Design a protein with these regions (language model features):
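An alpha-helical appendage that flanks or caps ligand/catalytic pockets
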Residues: 2-134
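C-terminal helical cap(s) of enzyme catalytic domains, especially alpha/beta-barrels
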Residues: 2-6, 152-169
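A structural alpha-helix within SAM-dependent methyltransferase catalytic domains
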Residues: 129-136, 160, 164
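Structural motif
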Residues: 138-140
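Histidine-centered catalytic/metal-binding microenvironments
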Residues: 147-148
């Protein structure tokens, strides 16, 4: 509403909101940074680092970097500065795998802090349902999930069977 009012517009009362995000239902005994979880959601989590890098390259802006990820950002920036690609073309290497797969050298940057800071729906079915209910209470109507492409069928099926079937509508 604030953004609309700044440009002299009024949002309709039934304004539909959707968030592009990612999800992974944890298996018993599994943690947020297990290999399977990174296989399924690493590409989307890493896209945040790519975005932060782009902003930083554009104007040095680091205001969008979550405080909980500041050390991770420093490590990632050092990692990018050692890339073989010349600075003028480095964006091509930065975005390799962007939203489709996690580049093996970047997997170490997928941390619990990054997942939480970027809104990932990662947890047990009950935890994910709670996250969805909290976001719904804030006005979110829909989530669009983007898992890593080679894991999409399994990831989306798990979400459908273990979360959506139990989510109250």
């Amino acid at each position: 509403e604030l953004g609309a009012s700044e440009v002299n517009r009024i949002l309709p009362s039934a304004f539909h909101t959707s968030a592009l995000t990612y999800a992974c239902v944890l298996k018993p005994g599994e943690n947020m940074v297990s290999d399977r979880v990174i296989d399924e959601i690493g590409a989307m989590a890493l896209a945040a680092l790519h975005y932060w890098w782009e902003l930083y390259q554009y104007n040095g802006d680091t205001s969008s970097i979550a405080k909980s990820c500041q050390n991770l950002w420093d490590e990632y920036l050092a990692f990018t500065e050692k890339m073989e690609t010349p600075p003028s073309k480095r964006f091509q290497q930065i975005h390799l795998g962007h939203c489709t797969f996690a580049v093996p050298e970047e997997r170490r940057f997928v941390t619990e802090n990054l997942i939480r800071a970027t809104g990932g729906l990662v947890g047990t079915p009950d935890e994910i349902i709670t996250m969805l209910e909290e976001r719904e209470a804030m006005g979110l109507n829909e989530v669009a999930l983007l898992p890593s492409m080679d894991q999409a069928r399994v990831n989306l099926n798990d979400f459908a069977e273990l979360v959506i079937k139990r989510y109250r509508c």
